[in-house]
């Protein structure tokens, strides 16, 4: 089940950080590392700092875009160290661990970490169902990339160990089929297309409304069947408009 949890690093600029992250992951039983458009490729320094976790580096998936790293996932959590102009559903690391383990039993989960200096962009954070923030000392809250991964990975492991001891899963948690990220992105594209065709949003300025709608649906988190209903509603609107003389 832990193999279903992806640790995703976006545009990492130092190979030593890749190695340190691999070490942090493996100590907690995580091995599924994804590198999105790394500014440098893993090298001997990454292997050296992995300190016995070189297999995690060697088996890492290297992709060009975040969308590729999130493909097939039903849950995406993005790390964020600061509040944004558009509030988003938040988790603390413990909640992140519990939710990740719960959902990884039936579909891949991605926990996304941003660039060393600037983190994730707003557009990248909007691809996430939740954001997670580590409650560090406000007077000195600087965590390097591997430290942040270690904190989250520890909470994932604690949640996984607790799930092994539990006699039965929480009611309904494993039975809820949530849509994959790919399906959600297709829905958002379909929604924007319909709203443009009806004149509800302007072609030159769709962003603000679409961002707020993303936030609304992220907060509501529709199940797969509910998303199918929404897609059907959009298709019905398109059909009705096409039938008009």
Swiss-Prot record:
Assembly and oligomerization: Homodimer.
Pfam entry (one): SpoU_methylase
InterPro entries: Alpha/beta_knot_MTases (IPR029028), RNA_MeTrfase_TrmJ/LasT (IPR004384), SpoU_MeTrfase (IPR001537), tRNA_m1G_MTases_N (IPR029026)
Originating gene: trmJ
Location of the protein in the cell: Cytoplasm
Keyword Glycoprotein attached: no
Domain of life the protein comes from: Bacteria
Record field: catalytic activity: cytidine(32) in tRNA + S-adenosyl-L-methionine = 2'-O-methylcytidine(32) in tRNA + S-adenosyl-L-homocysteine + H(+); uridine(32) in tRNA + S-adenosyl-L-methionine = 2'-O-methyluridine(32) in tRNA + S-adenosyl-L-homocysteine + H(+)
Protein name: tRNA (cytidine/uridine-2'-O-)-methyltransferase TrmJ
NCBIfam families in UniProt: PRK15114.1, rRNA_methyl_1
Protein family according to the UniProt entry: Belongs to the class IV-like SAM-binding methyltransferase superfamily. RNA methyltransferase TrmH family.
Any one Gene Ontology cellular component term annotated for this protein: cytosol
């Amino acid at each position: 089940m832990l193999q279903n949890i992806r640790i995703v690093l976006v545009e990492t600029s130092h190979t030593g950080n890749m190695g340190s992250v691999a070490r942090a992951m493996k100590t907690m039983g995580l091995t599924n590392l994804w590198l999105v458009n790394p500014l440098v490729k893993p090298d001997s320094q990454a292997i050296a700092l992995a300190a016995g976790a070189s297999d995690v580096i060697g088996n890492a998936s290297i992709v060009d875009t975040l969308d590729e790293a999130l493909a097939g996932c039903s849950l995406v959590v993005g790390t964020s160290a600061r509040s944004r102009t558009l509030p988003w559903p938040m988790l603390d690391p413990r909640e992140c661990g519990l939710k990740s383990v719960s959902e990884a039993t039936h579909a891949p989960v991605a926990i996304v970490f941003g660039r060393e200096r600037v983190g994730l962009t707003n557009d990248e954070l909007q691809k996430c169902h939740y954001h997670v923030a580590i409650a560090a000392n406000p007077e000195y809250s600087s965590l390097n990339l591997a430290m942040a991964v270690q904190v989250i990975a520890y909470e994932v492991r604690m949640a996984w160990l607790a799930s092994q001891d539990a006699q039965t899963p929480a009611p309904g948690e494993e039975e809820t089929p949530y849509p994959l990220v790919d399906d959600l992105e297709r829905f958002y594209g379909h929604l924007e297309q319909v709203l443009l065709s009806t004149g509800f949003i302007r072609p030159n300025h769709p962003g603000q409304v679409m961002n707020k709608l993303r936030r609304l649906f992220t907060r509501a988190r529709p199940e797969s069947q509910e998303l199918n209903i929404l897609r059907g509603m959009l298709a019905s609107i398109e059909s009705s408009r096409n039938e008009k003389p």
